[in-house]
């Protein structure tokens, strides 16, 4: 199926406001995306920090349950993220009508996929008991997974609204919603875990409420600022499917393999799983700014293609690689020289801390290379080449 934009291939090239200030535009987009993208990880990180003081079993449960919840969500997440490419190219072409149609298509897909994700998650919840070394850790995993899964529809609606705004070049509205959601999560999680003593269930419930509020705030901002979602047809839904499916399959396979690894680790001991959770949260938290830079570059590349200014794509790609590479190199050095200090923030158990530090040393090795990989794949998605990016992601 051909995109409406493909019928305009002979259209006159359009100027872009950022073509003479690429670095400024990249940073302007990237830092709010960093805050917004950190949302899911920050919420899980808060749960990890709070529950970690209850012992290894609850910590292992949050780690495995949070990973499994994201694994069930990742196909839908990857599918809906395709709207950013479509919208950025529509913005470059000056087609506001297509922006509205793609936003509507993404919201429709979010509702349907969200309901399917909840149904699948509730069926899979009993299996979580068998993904941990002890019965206590298994119960914690099942509880956390089951509750987090309930937020899937609202989380995906938030993704649809957020990715559309990214494509339009607005990263600050999603950031504002993220800040509100995370402040709510911190307050509620502290109340539920330490005051009401709800443990793992309290941490998960706080996150579900916070995710719902975050999506609600973004929806409200859209109403106030006149964002429209209308005009979606089968063609627009088909274009979202065409762009989103390769990325969705890639995410599903990547996260699926990661969950399998986490399940194997969790079957060894609570300490191994807890250490894995600490290292994972630190890596995700530190890596997402580089991911945000790559996402910002993807938006600029998409707008360049839509405006028929393909000569701008390569300079944007080179700039993205330089910025992301420098950042990930600094993170690797921090892991090596400050690993013990980082681990001490999560646990006072010396055995657990030592294991986590060793995992951070491993992360320091691949962090920079992974940053370059993500940057290249995001640029490819921005120009519409989602298949090659997906193949590389699956193979590597």
Regions found by a protein language model. Give the residues of each.
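Interfacial/gating helices of multi-pass transporter permease domains
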Residues: 28, 51-70, 136-143, 200-201, ...
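Helix-terminus/linker motif at the lipid-water interface of multi-pass membrane proteins
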Residues: 38, 42-60, 129-135, 191-198, ...
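Transmembrane helical elements of multi-pass membrane transporters/channels
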Residues: 28-47, 147, 151, 158, ...
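Transmembrane alpha-helix boundary and packing residues in multipass membrane permease domains
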Residues: 33, 37, 48-49, 66, ...
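Small-residue-rich hydrophobic transmembrane alpha-helices
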Residues: 59-122, 158-174, 275-333, 337-339, ...
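N-terminal transmembrane alpha-helices
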Residues: 18-49, 53-54, 67-82, 86, ...
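Short alpha-helical transmembrane segments in multi-pass integral membrane proteins
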Residues: 1-30, 87-154, 184-187, 193-245, ...
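Small-residue-rich segments of transmembrane alpha-helices in multi-pass membrane proteins
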Residues: 179-187, 396
